[in-house]
Amino acid sequence: MPVAGGRIPDRDIAAIREKVRIEDVVGDYVQLRRAGADSLKGLCPFHDEKTPSFHVRPNHGHFHCFGCGEGGDVYAFIQKIEHVSFVEAVELLADKVGYTVTYTGSSTTNVQRDRGSRSRLLAANAAAAEFYAEALQSEEAAPARQYLTERNFDAAAAAKFGCGYAPSGWDKLTKHLLRKGFEFKELEAAGLSREGKRGPMDRFHRRLLWPIRVSSGETIGFGARRLFDDDPNQAKYVNTPETVLYKKSQVLFGLDLAKRDIAKGHQAVVVEGYTDVMAMHLAGVTTAVASCGTAFGEQHLSMLRRLMMDDNFFRGELIYVFDGDDAGRAAAVKAFEGEQNLSGQSFVAVAADGMDPCDLRLRSGDGALRDLVARRTPLFEFVIRSALAEHDLDSAEGRVAALRRCVPMLARIKDPTLRDEYARQLAGWVGWDNVAQVIGRVREEAKGGGRKDNNRRGQETAARPKPPPVQRPDPTDPTLWPQREALKAGLQYPALAGPVFDTLTVESFTHPGYGAVRTAMEAAGGTSAGITGAQWIETVREQTTSPAAANLVNELSVETINVEDDEKLPRYISSVLARLQEVWVGRQIAEVKSKLQRMSPVEQGDEYHALFGDLVAMESYRRSLLEQASGDDLTA
């Protein structure tokens, strides 16, 4: 954990971990739902899935995905989701909870300079946003304020979205930030400044600015709008270049303001510009977002899917609001032709006269935008009808050409039921009497495309060597169920599992994976060591001898224990441990019986009778364990 001039002490790392609620941190990226006692679940942010397999255990400070295997504590989550180092993850979370990190081996004057690069870049962007917002009130910024006023955005709206102004001059922002203690290399890395012919210079000049924020509200870049005809940069909009913070394919403008309502209403509205997002929010459509400097893509879609998740199924709506021009129709077709993880719940809203949301609000008021969203059209229907509009359906030749154009488009729909339904509608729209013929052609086209896709996937799979399989127990194996539940109890509730768990031998766990976890728990001091929560899990992880065992610790530490409420946990855990003890004693009884069968009660009388007495005692003990294990709360 070393940094340039110092090391973060373990006490600070532990203190920050205790102050941070992992469910709050993860909740900035994933919509979480209750999944049992001390368990939350959602769609995994690290791989694409339709059924939630990502679990968070708040009281233990850990997460684990049963789909891709990712897991760990809150630091591991931030490292993975933000692509940062451990030091930067610690500093990011320290900033989040207002904790001042100290550094060993570092002088006081160098502490700030030694901070992880990500924290410094975030601080630079935050300072730049303040500078630009203040500059918007200057006399020079009158054209920028006029631009906003002409679009019916008042000062409150500008403040809500953080609007600012980049002043004229060579290096006003750069000098301001250098005076605040930042280095030029940091400003360059943040995309705020660049090296010019005459030295360091600002990236943006004489433009209206919007801060681009991540879902947690931190500024990571800016979008800038051209205001003056003599601006040498002819591009209407320019954005911060790709940086450590700003990845245009992974950010949506307005998401920090929209995420709560997107999750609550299971609906997201995708528009095409900064002013469109502002117009939508001010009109009451508070789920509006926009991509920044790039087209809306797969990673944007994945971000919204995770927010719109609801329990074990997906019921969200994604509404694209496009301009009515050719570019808007092309964008709709691109959305249709892309990955259809959401296509069945995707819609398109286009104003009758092709106006964008900002202009529509200016002309017709807030209600017009709400009506626009309410009158949305299913994406499939919009794309097909747009294609049909290019053909003369009053002629036989036009109808045939329309079918030839649209049948392959419908064949791309993955849902066979939905595909057949649109084939029926296509026949009606074209005026084709033989509906069955249209459905048949679409089905045939879909099968042909599927064979091509399968062949291509097979070739790709053959070309790539398969990674070695990870040896992990089958969580659904009923014969291993007591072992799995016992380990979950020992990891998640060591105080309740207590001394009884520690009496279980490693041999009680017949699967090598479970045995490895039990060995690590014993090496960590056992459940009676007095360590709980995230510290206990991390201590056990550190004692594992393989990545597979460490991953299994993560998995078991977050997997739900199916108990209705916490009051029933002690009884359940006691029953589970008794069941596992009973299985172990049963194996011992079998060995004793086998040994007795090989002995002669005449020739080995004393030894035989002593062993027989042990058998009677063991069977009595086994019966008591069976009674203890047969609690109402215990189900295999």
From Swiss-Prot:
GO BP term (any one): DNA replication, synthesis of primer
Signal peptide coordinates: none
Region span, Disordered: 443-481
GO terms under cellular component: cytoplasm; DNA-directed RNA polymerase complex; primosome complex
Comp. bias (Basic and acidic residues): 443-459
Record: residues binding Mg(2+) 1: 272, 323
This protein's record includes keyword Iron: no
GO molecular function, one term: zinc ion binding
Residue numbers binding Mg(2+) 2: 323, 325
CHC2-type zinc finger segments: 44-68
The enzyme's E.C. designation: 2.7.7.101
Keywords: DNA replication, DNA-binding, DNA-directed RNA polymerase, Magnesium, Metal-binding, Nucleotidyltransferase, Primosome, Transcription, Transferase, Zinc, Zinc-finger
Complexes and interactors: Monomer. Interacts with DnaB.
Record function comment: RNA polymerase that catalyzes the synthesis of short RNA molecules used as primers for DNA polymerase during DNA replication.
Family the entry assigns: Belongs to the DnaG primase family.
HAMAP family recorded: DNA_primase_DnaG
Record remark: domains: Contains an N-terminal zinc-binding domain, a central core domain that contains the primase activity, and a C-terminal DnaB-binding domain.
Protein's UniProt name: DNA primase
Organism: Mycolicibacterium smegmatis (strain ATCC 700084 / mc(2)155)
